[in-house]
Swiss-Prot record:
Belongs to the REXO1/REXO3 family. It is found in: Cytoplasm; Nucleus. GO terms for cellular component: cytoplasm; nucleus. Keywords: Cytoplasm, Exonuclease, Hydrolase, Nuclease, Nucleus, rRNA processing. This is RNA exonuclease 3. It is an enzyme of class 3 (hydrolase). Its EC number is 3.1.-.-.
Length: 645
């Protein structure tokens, strides 16, 4: 079968003259005497020029099997040889009238008089090409990533949600979608997130982890969950993919944020003195009249309204709607006879609020992106939740019912004290049998950010959930807490323990010491904090109204997003450890300082000036008292009928 093609006709027969085949496929041309003695052969075959004069050159140079040396071991062809070759195999004889052959001695061959060049380096493999680069100086503190070598095969589970073949097919598609995003990130020019480019082993591990999580958490709807995930992956932008990779690396290897920087935050500079900023703050005050429908309380509920609210609670027999999952359950303030506080068992929910991606002009081609929960990246409607709580919880928002638990109080006038400096405060709340109650209160001075008050608060109802993921308050904080003393420092004690007061009313009384009715009280979504403390204050500055959402109230911009956008600062980065109320209060105050600087640029261009601690309008302009506040429509979008022609 090989004879007509002659594929091996130029290859010397391994058996040489001892070959017993009548029609051997190898060459049996006479060999030169130099090949008779193998000890003289120390090089590879070099084809002479005369051997190819009568025909075209071959496509590839063929190498003979390396002969054995005197020691009996074959010399490796892969090892470069730098010394001169003493002798070479004889060239193929040129067919003629006889069996004569033309040969050239070693001294006549060009290849015998020069050194053999070393072999060319092989190209990098794909695994090496896409391996994560060395950590930068800022990431040198991170532990090395040691991804296990796993095959792309679904992990064994005690109760598999689907057949192995189905899981393997789904896993393959999931891995392919991740590889496409990883390749896209690797090709991104000028990328500063090179450590986020995963190696092949890390990609396999990430795909296995996600498939296993879906199989364990949602076995009944496993196929739907994972298929929606596969469809969603190609629609992710690079920024969204980077966030998912960071979350995976943090959970799998680092246990901290990969991009976390230990450098201190830059100090905010507005170019204004504290007195000037306080003077300009009077232009940022928002009247609350007309905002009652969005949760702002401007008057105390009457006794009749409070009694009606209590009667309604009594007739409902404790039935409430869960603030997390939306289910109905029954709550028992003071505990039921068997000691239970609620019914309904565990609560399955999503701790994060749903995120609705902004629309793009290409949505009619690529399709609109699905809304999802940032806590687990699941699309809305995929599952009932990714987190389980021990009990259901509820929240009370109606002012009349809030007053039935603890009545609202207006900020009192303190005749023995003069004007007070603006105060920025933040509250943390937890769930009890009476709803969402105050459990921590922090107040700082504005604009210096000096701590005035930081205390824990014992709620009035039995605690159902401290909401530690957001409040940052854990049971051990109450265990270590010490009773509040007015003579002690407002900060924590040396062992990290906070001071605690016995009720929300006591915490409210402490906050009133720093306020007058005309003292600007600053907060983010301040209606929630005021309602938790049961305070009615006429002079407020709310960053929700200073930085309104494009679609207006009741939609609000989050504090974390505003701080990142206007201050280039990262807050609320502790994950499951919760928020820091002091950090949030200072960040809220800095947002007001930024707005004050912007407002001063506008006022200065119109001729306004600052004398002492007061704003002086230009001649002929409206007085400061008439134009010192935001309009009543601040914070919410106007209707078309309200727009002037």
């Amino acid at each position: 079968m090989f004879a007509p093609l002659g594929l091996f006709k130029d290859v010397p027969c391994p058996e040489g003259q001892q070959c017993s085949l009548l029609t051997c496929i190898f060459s049996h041309d006479p060999l030169s005497p130099s090949l008779v003695n193998p000890s003289n052969v120390q090089g590879t075959l070099v084809a002479p020029e005369e051997a190819y004069e009568s025909g075209p050159p071959p496509k590839k140079p063929r190498l003979e099997t390396p002969p054995k040396t005197a020691g009996g071991k074959a010399q490796s062809l892969s090892e470069p040889r730098m010394e001169s070759i003493e002798s070479a195999p004889a060239p193929k004889a040129v067919r003629g009238s006889g069996l004569e052959q033309t040969t050239r001695t070693a001294s006549q061959l060009q290849s015998m008089t020069r050194e053999v060049s070393p072999p060319t380096l092989q190209k990098e493999s794909s695994a090496k090409k896409h391996a994560p680069p060395a950590a930068t100086e800022g990431e040198a503190h991170l532990p090395p990533r040691r991804a296990p070598r796993e095959s792309l095969n679904p992990r064994m589970l005690p109760k598999a949600p689907a057949a192995h073949g189905v899981r393997l097919s789904i896993l393959t598609k999931l891995h392919a979608a991740m590889c496409a995003l990883n390749e896209k990130l690797a090709k991104e020019e000028g990328s500063t997130d090179n450590p986020l480019v995963l190696s092949p082993n890390e990609l396999v591990t990430m795909a296995l982890d996600e498939e296993e999580k879906a199989a364990k958490d949602n076995p009944s709807i496993y196929a739907n969950v994972i298929k929606l995930r596969i469809v969603k992956l190609p629609k992710l932008s690079l920024e969204e993919w980077k966030k998912e990779v960071k979350a995976h690396l943090n959970e799998r290897y680092y246990k901290i944020e990969p991009t976390q920087r230990t450098a201190e935050q830059k100090t905010l500079e507005t170019g204004l003195s504290p007195k000037e900023e306080i003077a300009i703050a009077s232009k940022l005050i928002t009247p609350l009249e007309g905002l009652e429908q969005y949760g702002y309380v401007t008057r105390k509920p009457t006794k009749e309204e409070v009694e009606n609210a209590r009667r309604g609670v009594s007739e409902s027999k404790g039935w409430e709607k869960c603030d997390r999952c939306g289910g109905r359950f029954q709550v028992f303030p003071g505990r039921r006879e068997d000691g239970s506080l609620t019914t309904g068992g565990q609560c399955t929910y999503h701790p994060g609020k749903p995120y609705y991606p902004p629309r793009r002009q290409t949505d009619h081609i690529t399709g609109a992106r699905d809304a999802y929960f940032p806590c687990c990246n699941e699309s809305i409607g995929t599952s009932s939740g990714c987190t389980k709580g021990n009990t259901h919880v509820f929240k009370v928002s109606e002012s009349k019912r809030l007053a039935s638990i603890l009545q609202f109080e207006e900020t009192p006038t303190q005749a023995d004290k003069g004007p007070q400096q603006p105060v920025c405060f933040d509250c943390e709340m937890g769930y009890t049998t009476l709803g969402l109650e105050l459990i921590r209160l922090t107040a700082v001075s504005w604009p210096q950010g000096k701590l005035l008050l930081d205390i824990l608060v014992r709620p009035m109802g039995e605690i159902l959930d401290l909401n530690s993921r957001f409040s940052g308050v854990f049971p051990e904080h109450y265990q270590k807490a010490i009773p509040y003393k007015s003579t002690s420092s407002p900060s924590t004690t040396g062992d990290g323990a906070l001071q605690v007061v016995e009720s929300p009313a006591a915490a409210r009384a402490l906050l009133f010491k720093f306020l007058q009715p005309d003292t600007p009280l600053i907060g983010h979504a301040i209606d929630n904090d005021l309602n938790a403390c049961r305070i009615i204050h006429p002079t407020i500055i709310d960053t929700v109204l200073l930085y309104p959402h494009p679609r207006g109230l009741p939609i609000r911009m989050g504090l974390k997003a505003l701080v990142k956008k206007y201050l280039d600062r990262d807050i609320q980065t502790k994950g499951s450890q919760g928020h820091d109320s002091k950090e949030d209060a200072i960040a809220t105050g800095d947002l007001v300082r930024v707005k004050a600087a912007e407002t001063w640029k506008i006022l200065k261009s119109k001729g306004w000036r600052i004398e002492g601690s007061k704003l002086i309008p230009p001649p002929g302009a409206k007085g400061a008292s008439e134009d010192s506040k935001l309009g009543p429509g601040a914070g919410h979008k106007r209707k078309d009928t309200e727009v002037m022609p």
